[in-house]
């Protein structure tokens, strides 16, 4: 659709704001549409790793009995993937209709000094679309942080969910784990229940303090309450509290806990959304999360994962133990504002062939030569191929039948590889 591509370009060209970031711009934008975000039920999900998986567990299960909006980022292939209802993307026609609806207001606000960024416009479209479509509930993933993320314009979600917290977006969200946690805690709202991934005592007290100050009941669980039954390269089996023989097709050791967090939320809302144990069991098992520890090809075996910070990298390395392979061939790239030294060091320990390539993000991506220098601090046998398609082609050429190709380091890289493999 011609207009769709034109408007996508128009959205991308809305430059990032200079100076202090506030919610004032999106507030002005949504006020012009009578604040649709405050007229729908919202489950708001923040955290460093596991947001996407947890959102998918929640939305997929709730959609068994209800009309459920899901907002996630980043998307893998097309911007419309960010806004879905019961798994169906907003159509290109509707997307264009909403941009044309918003455009005059945006242009007026631009002149008044309230310029909304691409992500703020996308967020505003999402809230208005979900309201117009009369969703029963919207599961909304925070873009970055919490306090000043554009999704946090919602005044009172029916629940706030916070997954794992680790050092990511340092300098933007904070320079310590406590500062980053406080930023995520910004989604805790007056009286709205908060569901928390297991935290150490120090961080738990921090979240409890914020929850108490907002009169928000806090629910969490101990990892000891999750009984691992079986792990494999295609499913995880576990018990969580009264929920026995649960299964998830999202693999990786961390998914036991993401799924348990989702189950805790779903159990709380059983009556509101007419759920029972069987529906929850089916919803958890049939959930999918593109680009996160996903086997996208069986011959040759290609595994993709968007891990780019310490905690996610540790989870990836631990999860690889359930995959059977002779040699591990790595296709890797990473943004220079991520913990690249740690990622290179840990991946180098387990990789037989280390191939590096580039990412389509000129401002934040490494130049190939600079990334090569970083890898060579750890190992000499690095293969540098600038073109991402050539890099994955080279990996498939050298891979034998029982080898595993791992593509990781950035969702930008994973996105391009998925697109290439699918088209091939």
Identify the role of each PLM range.
Residues 1-47, 54-64, 70-73, 107-114:
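Short functional linear segments
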Residues 78, 122-172, 205-245:
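Extended acidic/charged loop-beta regions that coordinate divalent cations
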